[in-house]
From Swiss-Prot:
HAMAP family: ROTA_NSP4. Belongs to the rotavirus NSP4 family. Residues 52-175 are cytoplasmic. It is a single-pass type III membrane protein. It comes from the Viruses. Glycans are attached at N8, N18. This is Non-structural glycoprotein 4. The N-glycosyl content is primarily Man(9)GlcNAc, with a small amount of Man(8)GlcNAc. It is found in: Host rough endoplasmic reticulum membrane; Host membrane, Host caveola; Secreted. It comes from Rotavirus A (strain RVA/Human/Philippines/L26/1987/G12P1B[4]). GO terms for cellular component: extracellular region; host caveola; host cell rough endoplasmic reticulum membrane; membrane.
Amino acid sequence: MEKLTDLNYTLSVITLMNNTLHTILEDPGMAYFPYIASVLTVLFTLHKASIPTMKIALKTSKCSYKVVKYCIVTIFNTLLKIAGYKEQITTKDEIEKQMDRVVKEMRRQLEMIDKLTTREIEQVELLKRIHDKLMVQSTGEIDMTKEINQKNVKTLGEWESGRNPYEPKEVTAAM
C-alpha cells in the first residue's frame, strides 16, 4: 500500500509541476516547454529514486561516506548521459584502480621485454659461436698440380715421371 501511495504522490507532483509550468508559460508557441518538462521530470524521478536508496545504503553500510559519494557520482553520471555527454565523473578510488592496472600492465610488458632481450642476446651469442666454427681458416698454399687434369695441358716431356699417367697401360694376362 505504501508503494501505491508513493506512486500516487509521485504522479500528483508531476501533474502539479506540469500545471505550474503551463500556467507560467502560457505562450502556446513556447518551443522549449517539452524539454524543460522532461528535464524536471527526470530530476524529480532521480530525487525520488535516490532518497530511499541512500537511506537503505546508509543503514546497511558501515562506510556511509563512500556510499554517499558513490551514489552522488552515479546520479551525476546518469544526468551527464541523459544530457548526451560521453564523459563521466570518476572518484579517486576508480582513478587509483585504473592507475594500478596501468602500472601492472607496464610491469608485465617490461618483464616481457627483459625476457625477449635476454633471448636475443643468447641468440646472438649462439650465432657468433656458429660463425666462429664455420670460419674458413687458411692453411697455407696447397699444391694443386696433381689435382687438376693435366692430360691436355702438359706434354710428355713436362710430366714428372716422364710419361702421361692418363694413357692406358698394356696389361698382359696369363692364360
